């Protein structure tokens, strides 16, 4: 049986093309057939594959997630972007990372995703999903979007705003973080809700339970429509009177992990956080 690996590359980066050549050599040495993906490739067009290698930043990894969701295939990200929160390896490590992937020397980390539905006033339904976040934003910069939030079928608060972000723990370091939301450790199965520039006293970030359903209604009197964007890629229109529903999905994305480093260590590294003066380890060693 032929072993195949998906190879997704950020083509606009010259370093990505060089990294791809190195990855292809490692796959050839391991007897694994590479399947190169273009920007137009859809999941339905792909042959069966057992591995996925992504060379780029978080945006490229989100593109790869579209192709691997529901397959159970582990996804290995090699960071060629800026922060690269979803990536596991850096450019200089691409050869060793691909080798370990083909040899099965990695762990699996499952990241939850969101299911999204937009119910229009005429009864039509649009569906989407997100690994990071589903972001409802206004379509006119001069006006505010009027919404009412609902949790598990109960109204919570109505206000005017620039938008509302619904995020997974994975997405808590992305758009939700920029909007003032908390950083949430990836093993927390919460649904994070972050109002954007809300005109209300009670419009603070919320963390809902893993089984909660978030409803966002664009009030009929809202003078503008909204646009719901999933992971910055898939867009759904939300007219006044429409309703958005967000809940956790049972179809996670599987990330290949080569290092046992805890999330705290990754957070410090990715954000270059200062930890000068920490004596926790020394104090722990002093305890009886």
Label for each model-derived stretch:
Residues 1-51, 55, 91-107, 118-128, ...:
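ATP/NTP phosphate-donor binding region
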Residues 85-162:
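Catalytic core of DAGKc-family lipid kinases
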Residues 154, 158-202:
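Gly/Ser/Thr-rich active-site loops/lids in small-molecule metabolic enzymes
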């Amino acid at each position: 049986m032929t072993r195949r690996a998906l190879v997704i590359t950020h083509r606009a980066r010259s370093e990505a093309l060089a990294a791809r050549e190195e990855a292809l050599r490692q796959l050839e040495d391991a007897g694994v057939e590479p399947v190169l993906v273009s920007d137009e490739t859809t999941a339905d067009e792909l042959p069966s594959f057992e591995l996925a290698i992504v060379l780029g930043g978080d945006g490229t990894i989100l593109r790869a997630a579209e192709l691997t969701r529901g397959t159970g295939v582990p996804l290995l990200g090699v960071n060629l972007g800026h922060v690269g929160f979803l990536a596991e390896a850096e450019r200089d490590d691409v050869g060793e990372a691909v080798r370990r992937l083909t040899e099965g020397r990695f762990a699996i980390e499952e990241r939850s995703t969101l299911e999204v539905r937009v119910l229009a006033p005429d009864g039509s339904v649009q569906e989407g999903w997100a690994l990071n976040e589903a972001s409802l934003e206004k379509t006119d910069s001069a006006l505010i979007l009027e919404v009412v939030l609902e949790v598990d079928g109960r109204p919570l608060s109505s206000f005017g705003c620039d938008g509302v972000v619904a995020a997974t723990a994975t997405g808590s370091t992305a758009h939700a973080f920029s909007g003032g939301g908390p950083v949430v450790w990836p093993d927390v199965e919460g649904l994070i809700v972050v109002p954007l520039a809300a005109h209300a006293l009670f419009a603070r970030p919320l963390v809902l339970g893993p089984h909660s359903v978030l409803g966002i209604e664009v009030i009929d009197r809202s003078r503008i429509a909204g646009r719901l964007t999933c992971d910055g890629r898939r867009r759904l229109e939300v007219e006044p009177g429409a309703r958005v529903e967000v809940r956790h999905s049972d179809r996670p994305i599987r990330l290949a992990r080569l290092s046992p480093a805890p999330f705290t260590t990754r957070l410090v590294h990715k954000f270059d956080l200062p930890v000068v003066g920490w004596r926790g380890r020394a104090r722990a060693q002093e305890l009886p």
